[in-house]
């Protein structure tokens, strides 16, 4: 848990609940725990108890945002100025900060291929020009190609956990520089394996990238971006061909076709939740094919 406390004074219940709520949703969101002893739980307290002696804002406020240290930010920007083949892997921190549109704008303006971590919420629509699929080198060959050919990988709002091979090869080859940008110190601590780290709200970092681009300090050749789109197109065509070939002369329903049919029936307000074994395996492939 991010925060745990035992309430020893019933008049302070609103204070503890308010603090726990804000801690749970700030920085790197996570669970909190409050214990209320039985004697307090079954007691009564005035609704306005504690308002005068411990005043605090009770309404919900926007979570505090981390702004990057100028020197640390400059090191990341200098790294990108030298890069020819960057990739960006976006994680749940982008979702929590509500900066998906800024993420997409960065991809459009700077021509950076964008991959989504292979779990948590989807950040960009499948139809987005800059979205290249999930960052999964085992099930999605285009992401493997991108990471093997890249010279810089930016992970924004994500963790170097088991799905990212803890920042090690073969997921992140030794040939590239890995930079992690996170909005809270505790999450940044998970990414100690990165070559470079930056404490920054994702939106603040995206803003800095756009400003650097506007000043023509960061400019990337579109050939790298186009090659990643080409790799995705070739992979989708191959998967469709393989599924159709396996289905020929068989009365059985191919699991990939099932996954694609489920997606085809979904609308913009529908949610797709997947987990477990073959269901996850084939549905993840279908997700990477969607929107092409």
Identify the residue ranges that each predicted region occupies.
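Gly-rich Lys/Arg/Thr-decorated short loops/hinges at beta-loop-alpha junctions or inter-strand turns
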Residues: 1-2, 49-61, 125-126, 233-246, ...
């Amino acid at each position: 848990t991010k925060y745990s406390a035992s309430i020893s004074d019933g008049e302070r219940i609103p204070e503890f609940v308010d603090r726990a709520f804000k801690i749970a949703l700030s920085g790197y969101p996570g669970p909190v725990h409050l214990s209320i002893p039985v004697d307090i739980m079954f007691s009564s307290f005035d609704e306005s108890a504690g308002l005068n002696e411990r005043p605090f804002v009770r309404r919900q406020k926007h979570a505090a945002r981390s702004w990057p240290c100028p020197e640390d930010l400059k090191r990341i920007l200098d790294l990108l100025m030298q890069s020819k083949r960057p990739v960006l892997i976006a994680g749940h921190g982008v979702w929590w900060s509500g900066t998906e549109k800024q993420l997409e704008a960065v991809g459009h303006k700077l021509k950076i291929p964008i991959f989504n971590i292979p779990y948590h919420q989807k950040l960009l629509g499948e139809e987005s020009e800059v979205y290249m699929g999930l960052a999964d080198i085992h099930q999605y060959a285009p992401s493997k190609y991108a990471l093997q050919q890249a010279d810089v990988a930016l992970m924004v709002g994500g963790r170097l956990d088991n799905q990212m091979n803890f920042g090690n090869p073969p997921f992140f080859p030794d040939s590239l520089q890995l930079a992690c940008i996170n909005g809270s110190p505790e999450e940044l601590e998970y990414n100690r394996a990165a070559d470079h780290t930056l404490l920054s709200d994702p939106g603040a970092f995206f803003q800095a990238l756009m400003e650097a681009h506007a000043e023509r300090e960061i400019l990337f050749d579109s050939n790298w971006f186009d090659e990643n789109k080409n790799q995705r197109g070739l992979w989708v065509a191959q998967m469709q061909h393989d599924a159709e070939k396996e289905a020929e002369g068989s009365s059985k329903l191919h699991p990939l076709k099932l996954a694609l049919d489920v997606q085809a029936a979904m609308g913009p307000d529908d949610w797709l939740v997947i987990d477990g074994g073959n269901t996850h395996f084939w549905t993840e492939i279908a997700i990477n094919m969607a929107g092409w």
